[in-house]
Curated annotation (Swiss-Prot):
Organism: Pseudomonas entomophila (strain L48)
Mode of membrane association: Peripheral membrane protein
Cell inner membrane listed as a keyword: yes
Subunit structure: The complex is composed of two ATP-binding proteins (HmuV), two transmembrane proteins (HmuU) and a solute-binding protein (HmuT).
Known EC number: 7.6.2.-
Purpose: Part of the ABC transporter complex HmuTUV involved in hemin import. Responsible for energy coupling to the transport system.
Protein name per its UniProtKB record: Hemin import ATP-binding protein HmuV
Single GO MF descriptor: ATP binding
């Protein structure tokens, strides 16, 4: 579980996040939405410890985030940044296996977990391929498998932070990726995912944080956050919102 209280973050003299309060709960996905420059990636940087808040606190399982020793924190918290680069000709299996470095579970168990994580990310058929030979979308799925392997199987007490994990993916793999994330949360992990697609967020997230100029415009269920008034205020778009005819979650249609 990750708790954020009164978080403020500065970059130089500019405050990019102001008074952010949220809780990542076991078994749930929190989606973060907002226009470019709203502070989404800065928020993820503060939550993973890459950026230090100017005020407020981030606690992982009741303990200040920076008080956790590196490997111990890595066994509980995994991060998929917006861009992951790797310049070595590792096989896909080796790249995903990097997620197991904080653990001492043995080679056989690690191999089993790597195989399971690749399957969850719909990347099992890529296992023996060179990472450098993959397309951008394939690389994105491999890095998803890596962070899933780091926390596998996704039990309570683990937290997964994802920055636009569907940005390079075709429509099918956007859904298979978020289905894998949904399954991970259903097994007990707490998940935060930054998205740009409003309808994907409405379908897969339990709660949504809507950011505007570094502040929380709304934090609630998709039904309460994804309203025409809120989306017009934050994104400047005119939309129709109606229940999905089969699933019931909000369906957003641009007018």
């Amino acid at each position: 579980m990750l708790d954020v209280e009164g978080l403020h973050l500065k970059r130089g003299s500019s405050e990019v996040l102001s008074d952010i309060r949220l809780q990542l709960r076991p078994g749930q996905i929190l989606g973060v939405l907002g226009p470019n420059g709203a502070g989404k990636s800065s928020l993820l940087g503060a939550l993973c410890g890459e950026l230090s808040p100017s005020a407020g606190q981030v606690r992982l399982d009741g303990r200040d985030l920076h008080a956790w020793p590196g490997q111990e924190r890595a066994r509980r918290l995994a991060v998929l940044p917006q861009a992951s680069s790797l310049g070595f000709a590792f096989s896909v299996e080796e790249v995903v296996g990097l997620g197991r470095l904080p653990h001492a579970s043995g080679r056989q168990r690690d191999r089993e977990i790597v195989e399971a994580a690749l399957a969850a990310a719909d990347a099992g058929h890529l296992a023996s391929r060179s990472y450098l030979a993959l397309s951008g979308g394939e690389r994105q799925r491999v890095h998803l498998a890596r962070v899933l392997a780091q926390l596998w199987p996704g039990e309570a007490g683990t937290t997964l932070l994802l920055d636009e994990p569907t940005s390079a993916l075709d429509p099918l793999h956007q859904h298979t990726t978020l289905q894998a994330v949904r399954s991970f949360a259903d097994r007990g992990a707490a998940v935060l995912v930054i998205l740009h697609d409003l309808n994907l967020a409405a379908r897969y997230c339990d709660h949504i944080l809507l950011l505007e100029h570094g502040r929380s415009h709304a934090l609630d269920t998709p039904q309460r956050v994804l309203t025409p008034a809120a989306l017009n205020a934050v994104f400047g778009i005119d939309v129709l919102v109606q229940p999905h005819p089969e699933r019931g979650h909000p369906l957003i249609i641009t007018r």
